[in-house]
């Protein structure tokens, strides 16, 4: 058999496809990250070893702020290239919608790295607006106000505008115009009004229904005309400065984007012909991330276009429409939060143990005294070959079903059942291996890989750290971060440590396609085996829930300084005490209750005084400990 190489691992896990030049495999067989343009490589295994020395254990979220900087710069440079190519005379504004990841350390890094590109922020709720107004220090950066709004929301936005913030209030529903007029009159402010338009065009992929006629937000063309009449009646003609549209997140097909842009451009042209000097067009989100690295529109986890192609289409469409109608080019806004933030975070989890289906030892031979079903199944196993494979598969299934029925009726004993089950799974393994060499695998054999896969139990909560994997079957690239110079000999699915059968992952990127199993290595004694889950920087942290009371994981910010990595900040994961407090348990009261119970048990002679002290000490220490296994 050919010796396994690093190149084989690169191909198997398709790291060159989804890694987007940020991730690779070094000569040691470890995954590295290259956050900066100077190509400094940071070994993820080295980071985990250093964190372990600091008593920071997996699961841990590794954030690389330099990647945020690179993603912002890449988007801005794509606009600059498009500007030069198409003669675009407007300004472009990169906006980060904080709903993508509202964690203060992440937003702080984005603002810091985005200053040189005048990056703005978007708020979609009242709490988000409170955060955005306070952290966005640059007065010339845009703040876009989306989502449902009440009077206090609009008052906060207009007061901030009055004090110098560059704020646009985007009307999602007609009644919001009345609130804006009321508050603006009270504050004596001339509001910057935007209108979200409900396009007929829709996106593609998991969020296609975010656009089109079924979309939740936006005004139809008829409602837009009603809104324009209201604007005239209110004396806000000059206040309408922006139109906004959004056809969905993670748009997989560039053609859908092109269609939406052409439709939106006509709204821009028509509004100008009606006398409205709209000077901003907010193209919303939708710029996708290639999670599986296939660059295919047929996959909901991929996209068939680049950032440059997306930007080119945005710029060209509005330049072309404006030029043909002798209208000024609009200032273009993009809200591409997923594209900006997905790559910068890697979740590292450790494998606790594995479980596999029982198999019969190769040296086993059926004896005359064995049950007839054992002898029949042994004969099938002993004579398996490609010609009779499917017939043998059917016979083996029938024997197993019969054995289970006989066991339920007390006719077959436990030893016989165990032998038949182990031999059945051995037959399945051999049939699966034979099927891999067939040009056309029978339909009923195609699911054997998944059925026969080992279970790798990992120290994390799917619901806390990868909620989209559970909720919408979002695919994330997953692979070992070490031993990649070794052949992975086990096929596995991943199980989390929650008490929920949904807490598993059984869809993976392998060999450039989506598979039901992940090739992994056997565990080694006293050696941690780490898996990296990549591209998790968008939505996952903020959408995570506390199923089984597993809290936020440890997190670390790692940057490059003078050609070496530096762990800038460490954020401890939530403790048992903190998560109990979320669900309204008072930890101090819990301790007092335990003290009373232990005192009573000591007095009754059930435990000794020392045992009582040890129990209370263990309990108190546990309250301040990590919610995950240590």
Where are these regions (language model features)?
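Flexible, glycine/charged-enriched surface loops at secondary-structure junctions
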Residues: 58, 62, 84-89, 274-278, ...
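Helical (often loop-to-helix) elements that flank the catalytic cores of nucleotide-handling enzymes
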Residues: 299-314, 363
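Charged (often Lys/Glu-rich) extended helix/loop segments that serve as interaction or gating elements
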Residues: 313, 319-630
